[in-house]
A protein has these predicted regions:
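Hinge/cleft segment of the Venus flytrap/periplasmic-binding protein
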Residues: 6, 10-18, 28-29, 122-166
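Hydrophobic alpha-helical
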Residues: 26, 42-108
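Short, hydrophobic secondary-structure boundary micro-motifs
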Residues: 38-41, 94, 118-119, 145-147, ...
Length: 166
């Protein structure tokens, strides 16, 4: 692997708990020994918006700073960054781009070779988890204060499994 990687982070809406948590998770992972070679060059918000992310990435590209990847709090922002990089003639094979949500557009971007990784939030699994908790409560059974449904990593290697889910 690489000895050093410089990345940009595109955050969601700053007042949104999911954006705050996702950004904290990025920071926490980069702080681990396995990822300590990754340096965040800059972190800005796109408010979950594709156009804002495209403008943000265009501004970053105009600085001329070398970078190796973009980590976005959502797929719309990742796609906006991809559009800016393609417009700026960046070789998409030379950068790693990640998002969250496994939207149809994101899966299409992955199939095109532009998006490297996204995360699938299992809505059916979340619904089933909520229903299961409600049924337990109705029966007077104990339920954990928080019920977690694991996210699933989507890569070109397993994308076929997710194309049918969204």
């Amino acid at each position: 692997g690489k000895k050093k990687a410089n990345v940009y982070v595109i955050m969601g809406e700053l007042s949104n708990q999911a954006a705050v948590q996702r950004t904290k998770d990025i920071d926490d992972v980069i702080a681990t020994p396995d990822c300590s070679f990754i340096k965040i060059i800059d972190k800005q918000t796109s408010n979950w918006n594709r156009d804002e992310a495209q403008n943000l990435m265009t501004n970053w590209l105009s600085t001329g700073k070398p970078f190796d990847g973009v980590i976005a709090n959502n797929d719309e922002s990742a796609i906006g960054a991809i559009q800016a990089m393609k417009a700026g003639n960046i070789d998409m094979k030379a950068v790693v781009v990640g998002g969250v949500d496994a939207t149809q557009d994101a899966l299409a971007a992955m199939q095109a070779g532009d998006l490297d990784v996204t995360v699938f939030q299992d809505a059916a699994g979340q619904g089933a988890g909520a229903l299961d908790a409600a049924l337990k409560l109705a029966k007077g059974e104990k339920v954990e204060h928080k019920v977690y449904v694991p996210f699933q990593l989507v890569t070109p290697a397993n994308i076929d499994k997710f194309l049918k889910k969204n």
